[in-house]
Amino acid sequence: KYLLQIIMENSGFFKRIFSLVYDSLLILGIIFSLTLLLVFLNGGAPENGGIIDLLQLFVTIFSGPIFYSYFWLVNDGQTVGMQAWKIKLISEEKLTIRICLLRCAFSTFSFLFFGLGYLYIFFNEEKKSLADLATKTRIAKIN
């Protein structure tokens, strides 16, 4: 298994972005569902400054990292979007929650800065993003 991971070719920019869009739609659905639950628990009334607002903030901020970390750790380095686009996360070390969360943080910041972390793939010979380099991981094509 490890030898196969070494010889897998790294995924390019577009497969990663299409996978990201696919996963983002799923995460958006999760956020909407949890928001609906919070509104229901609050009796359907909007409340400013209460515990419901704090829970909503938590749901909005942490749904993505929890989604990605869960699938990467439990599903052999693949989210649903990654499965659809036949790519997977491979780590030089054993994949841990720390690596997953760091990767999410680097990916988020690189996206917020005009996608520079992802655009770096075009200039990197190994097709690695800045998040890949920072976390000693890579996104590889699978057959």
Where do the model's predicted regions map?
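Membrane-interfacial and juxtamembrane segments of integral membrane proteins
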Residues: 2-143
